[in-house]
Regions:
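Internal nucleotide-binding/catalytic subdomain
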Residues: 1-102
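Active-site "cap" helix and flanking loop/linker of ATP-utilizing ligase/carboxylase catalytic domains
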Residues: 54-76, 93-145
């Protein structure tokens, strides 16, 4: 599962989740890729799991960055594996994922510029990020090679 937040160094705002498909062939077969498709929201997420993700992974990471003198501003993308309702961090990226963001951004009702501007100016607490409740899919078409 892909879990996204944006932080202005003080405030954390969660974005929608997504689930990507890395294998080049149907049925989870073939070589790994950067992502052949995605859907949002992830069917794995529920309220108790989201609380675990925030409290065990995201918030401690932001706190550790602060303790190291880094006032992190921007997107943080946690690539997670969920085992028996427990989240395990596989990777972090400091960007939106692709193709995940192609499923997430169409669901965003709040102006993305306003969110990023608030992030840059340390005013995320003043932004209410709103989403539509639709589901979204993305399929990547690519050439062989």
């Amino acid at each position: 599962m892909s879990y996204f937040i944006i932080s202005d160094g003080k405030e954390i705002k969660s974005f929608e989740t997504a689930q990507d498909h890395k294998r080049v062939l149907e049925g989870d077969k073939g070589a790994n890729t950067g992502g052949m498709g995605a859907y949002s929201p992830s069917r794995l997420l529920n309220q108790p799991l989201e609380e675990k993700i925030l409290n065990k992974i995201i918030k401690p990471t932001i706190t550790a960055l602060e303790e190291m003198g880094s006032n992190y501003k921007g997107f943080l993308y946690a690539g997670l594996m969920i085992v028996k309702d427990e989240p395990y961090l596989i990777e972090y990226n400091v960007r939106m994922g692709d193709p995940e963001c192609q499923t997430i951004l169409p669901k965003l009702k709040t102006d993305l510029f306003e969110i990023i501007n608030a992030c840059c100016n340390e005013n995320l607490q003043d932004i209410n990020i709103e989403w539509n409740d639709k589901k979204s899919k993305c399929i990547v078409l690519c050439s062989k090679g």
